[in-house]
Amino acid sequence: MQRLVLVSILLCANFSCYPDTFATPQRASIKALRNANLRRDESNHLTDLYQREENIQVTSNGHVQSPRFPNSYPRNLLLTWWLRSQEKTRIQLSFDHQFGLEEAENDICRYDFVEVEEVSESSTVVRGRWCGHKEIPPRITSRTNQIKITFKSDDYFVAKPGFKIYYSFVEDFQPEAASETNWESVTSSFSGVSYHSPSITDPTLTADALDKTVAEFDTVEDLLKHFNPVSWQDDLENLYLDTPHYRGRSYHDRKSKVDLDRLNDDVKRYSCTPRNHSVNLREELKLTNAVFFPRCLLVQRCGGNCGCGTVNWKSCTCSSGKTVKKYHEVLKFEPGHFKRRGKAKNMALVDIQLDHHERCDCICSSRPPR
C-alpha cells in the first residue's frame, strides 16, 4: 500500500500536476505502466522506466509535447502517441521552433530522442529520429492515416526545452492533372505558431521530378529562390553553419566554404572534353597482316556525359567537333621468317596517322549541332 502511494505521488510530481503535459484534449485513450521493480541510483533517484501510451483520434488541430515543455523533461521516460485520422486523410506534423534534447553520440541518437514512424497494415516506416539542439526537425506529411510518435529519455542527462509537435489532418485527394512541381505555400496556425507547408491538394514531389527541377538551375541561389522565395537567404546561410550532428568528415577538414556553383559549372564545362584514350593500332588501322610495337598508343578522344544534370542531358552524346590527324613513329612487323643475322626485311620503323579530337561538342536529339 505504501508503494502505491509513493508511485502516485511521483506520478503527480512528474506529470499530472503539469497542465497540458502530453496532448491537447481530443478523443484519446491512455495506458500507463511503471515497472514493478523500482531501482534507485547512487543519488537516490528512481531509475526504472516510466512508460505511457496514448491513442489520439485526429479530428482537428492539436499538439503533443515532452513533459514540462519548455523546461527540462524528466528522466527515464518512454512515451508513445498513436495518431489516427479518418480514412482518405493524412496527418501533418510540424515541430515547434523551440527544440532541444540530449546531444547525439557519434551522430547517433542513442539516449534521449523523439522518433516518428508511419504505420500501415503491411509495414512501418521510420520517418526520422532526432535529438540535440542544432536543427529543428522538418515538417512531415504522412502517406497513411496513422503515425506513431515515440519519446525516450534515459537516466542520465536531460535537456530543455524538449519538444512540441503540432498535428493536423489533411485531405488525401490529388487533382488528376496536377503538375509535379506546382507548389503552393499555405499557412496553418496552432496556438499562435505559424509554419508554411505545401498545398494539401498538390502531390508529393517525387525524386525524379525534383531531379528535373534541380537540373534547370545553374546556381544554388537560383535553386533556393525557386523552392523558398521568401526564406531563401536564410536557407543559404544555414547551409554553411557548423552543425556537426549532420556533417561528414569532408565538412570539418576543409578550411573554407565549398563553392557549389563552381563544382556545378566544372561538370558542365569539362564533362564533354578531349581526354587520353588508348587505341590498339591493329584495330585502329584495320590491319590484319601487320603487328606494331608499341601495340597501343594514347590519343585524344572525346568522352564524358555532356554535363550530367543539364536539361535533356540523357539524350545527348559527346562527339568530336574538330578532328585532326597526327603522325606517330612505331616499329612495324610483318608475318614471315625472321633472320637471326643480318637486316630483317619484314621489320621497319614507319609513320602512321591517328585521329585526335581537338574539340568536343554535345550532340542532342532536341537541338542541331553547333
UniProtKB/Swiss-Prot annotation:
One of its GO terms (molecular function) is growth factor activity. Residues 52-170 form the CUB domain. Expressed at high levels in developing heart, lung, kidney and some muscle derivatives. Moderately expressed in liver, brain and testis. In the kidney, localized to glomerular mesangial cells and vascular smooth muscle cells. Up-regulated in areas of renal fibrosis. In mice with unilateral ureteral obstruction, expressed in interstitial cells at day 4, with an increased to maximal expression at day 14. Gene3D superfamilies: Cystine-knot cytokines, Spermadhesin, CUB domain. It is found in: Secreted. It comes from the Eukaryota. The record marks 247-250 as: Cleavage. Glycans are attached at residue 276. The keyword Glycoprotein applies. Residues 1-23 form the signal peptide. Transmembrane segments: none annotated. Keywords: Cleavage on pair of basic residues, Developmental protein, Disulfide bond, Glycoprotein, Growth factor, Mitogen, Proto-oncogene, Secreted, Signal. InterPro entries: CUB_dom, Cystine-knot_cytokine, PDGF/VEGF_dom, Sperma_CUB_dom_sf. Disulfide bonds join 109-131, 302-360, 306-362. Activated by proteolytic cleavage. Proteolytic removal of the N-terminal CUB domain releasing the core domain is necessary for unmasking the receptor-binding epitopes of the core domain. Cleavage after Arg-247 or Arg-249 by urokinase plasminogen activator gives rise to the active form. CDD domains: CUB, PDGF. SUPFAM superfamilies: Cystine-knot cytokines (SSF57501), Spermadhesin, CUB domain (SSF49854). Growth factor that plays an essential role in the regulation of embryonic development, cell proliferation, cell migration, survival and chemotaxis. Potent mitogen for cells of mesenchymal origin. Plays an important role in wound healing. Has oncogenic potential and can induce tumor formation. Induces macrophage recruitment, increased interstitial pressure, and blood vessel maturation during angiogenesis. Can initiate events that lead to a mesangial proliferative glomerulonephritis, including influx of monocytes and macrophages and production of extracellular matrix. Belongs to the PDGF/VEGF growth factor family. This is Platelet-derived growth factor D. It comes from Mus musculus.
